[in-house]
């Protein structure tokens, strides 16, 4: 694969204070301080975080649609689509299962809930009833049927990632099958990609404001002190996720010829955004763009990233088995090996419906415990207060897992420019887009 060289010299480095990751860090620190010292006012800033996430969700559907359609329509052989999808699902299934097992093993070794001796009958279940009610709406058949939208337009109106993915794949295949007659449509969609991604860049400038509001609300409402009683569970989850990313995914990255630490550094701005908003979905458009810049083919990025947001949730899977066994230990429920295998199997299925939105992990945990009656659902009240703090770690782990999956599947498919990947991870790749000249410097375009 040929690497095109920039037409001119690279622009001067952007000062650190103008870089997104620095601005997000400052916003998170200021938001945390405000939440601690002025909790009442900080709680009122929740709309800032919510508004930013809504802005990002607004652009996700067009980004996914354009990336997938132009990628598939540009493929020489349509068999490639099925092959990439099959490889992606194989990867997702293996590592999702591994994450569930890791969470279960850590729960047995660390025993975070041992000695609490909680009586489930004495717990206030009213706080978790909302989540349990939502979890009853989750089922495998319902999840699969929900992938098919009521109309082509409703997929975009509802912003359902899997529905948009479904429509985009079908439209991309149809566009490829009509051949030259579809060339004008493909050219239009490729031209439309530029302003859509420019809009993504514009929205990302509001990331510090969104992160500030979200973290201020979190600290103001729940307080840092709410972590103390369940610090052992929270600490176990963070350390387990760190182990999964640095060791397990680190080994995978090393076998594929790159460093997971360099990948994390490459995605630092997006990771800080995910940290501030507790939603991996907030950085989805940027992740897709950066994976293309890192040498992954557009068609692979368009299929792997959106699919991974529902099927490759490593952080959520670790959380589900760890939290379920914590509740079992805290309520003195001794699970047999068969019951634990059942728990793992149910968690595997229920986790597939959890998209990268805040609170999805807690809902899928409720779905799992509702199906496995051995662990009391009322025990979820024990972790409700600290679940919001574990949400950040879930989202970060999910995000990194999907970035690694994109590179691995691209390499597996021989659709990875390794030289470009090295340049990007070393910080030597050209910027995502060239600076836009002022209006008076734009030359008129002659008609062709």
Curated annotation (Swiss-Prot):
Location in or out of the cell: Cell inner membrane
One biological process term in Gene Ontology: L-aspartate transmembrane transport
PROSITE patterns associated with the record: NA_DICARBOXYL_SYMP_1, NA_DICARBOXYL_SYMP_2
GO CC, alphabetical: plasma membrane
Region Disordered: start-end pairs: 428-448
Keyword field contains Acyltransferase: no
Keyword Metal-binding: no
Keywords associated with the record: Cell inner membrane, Cell membrane, Membrane, Symport, Transmembrane, Transmembrane helix, Transport
Residue ranges, compositional bias (Pro residues): 432-441
Transmembrane segments annotated in the record for this chain: 20-42, 51-73, 88-110, 138-157, 161-178, 198-220, 230-252
Membrane topology annotation: Multi-pass membrane protein
Domain of life of the native organism: Bacteria
Similarity annotation: Belongs to the dicarboxylate/amino acid:cation symporter (DAACS) (TC 2.A.23) family.
Its job: Responsible for the transport of dicarboxylates such as succinate, fumarate, and malate from the periplasm across the membrane.
HAMAP family named in the record: C4_dicarb_transport
The protein, known as: C4-dicarboxylate transport protein
Organism per entry: Xanthomonas campestris pv. campestris (strain ATCC 33913 / DSM 3586 / NCPPB 528 / LMG 568 / P 25)
